[in-house]
């Protein structure tokens, strides 16, 4: 018989930098999970993606064991890395902060495909372009 899931915790943690301090400690402590065990496993699994924020979905079972699934980094984080900026524009409709080439948008869309509900890469590109527009990033060919 399969173990029964009692709680699902969703967090966004910098890759390779999970530690028992907030937000990880309190979220997992309430569920009764071995926090250091999770931190070590997460850091080992995401060591190659340093500098990116990784969404993670942790399933906690009745016996306090857990499994977790790492997702692809948010499109906004990938766009900031591609554009070389710290943050998006406060006024995206008036003030543009960077430009990104369309082939870079395609690369980001292909990276995000497993987590998006898009039927094709072109549809995923439109989603990423929308995120870029809302951040004040101009897309050029």
Swiss-Prot record:
Keywords: Methylation, Ribonucleoprotein, Ribosomal protein, RNA-binding, rRNA-binding
Protein name per Swiss-Prot or TrEMBL: Large ribosomal subunit protein uL11
GO biological process, one term: translation
Cellular-component GO terms for this entry: cytosolic large ribosomal subunit
Protein's job: Forms part of the ribosomal stalk which helps the ribosome interact with GTP-bound translation factors.
Keyword Signal: no
Coiled coil (residue ranges): none
Species of origin: Lysinibacillus sphaericus (strain C3-41)
Keyword rRNA-binding applies: yes
Gene3D superfamilies, A to Z: Ribosomal protein L11, C-terminal domain, Ribosomal protein L11/L12, N-terminal domain
Classification via HAMAP family: Ribosomal_uL11 (MF_00736)
């Amino acid at each position: 018989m399969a173990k029964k899931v009692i709680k699902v915790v969703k967090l966004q943690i910098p890759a390779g930098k999970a530690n028992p301090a907030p937000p990880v400690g309190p979220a997992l402590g309430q569920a009764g999970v071995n926090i250091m065990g999770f931190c070590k496993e997460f850091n080992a699994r995401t060591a190659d993606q340093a500098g990116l924020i990784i969404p993670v979905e942790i399933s906690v079972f009745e016996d306090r064991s857990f499994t977790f699934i790492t997702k692809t980094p948010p499109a906004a984080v990938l766009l900031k890395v591609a554009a070389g900026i710290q943050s998006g524009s406060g006024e995206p409709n008036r003030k543009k902060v960077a430009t990104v080439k369309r082939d870079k948008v395609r690369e980001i869309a292909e990276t995000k495909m497993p987590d998006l509900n898009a039927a094709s890469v072109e549809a995923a590109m439109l989603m990423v372009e929308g995120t870029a527009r809302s951040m004040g990033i101009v897309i050029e060919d």
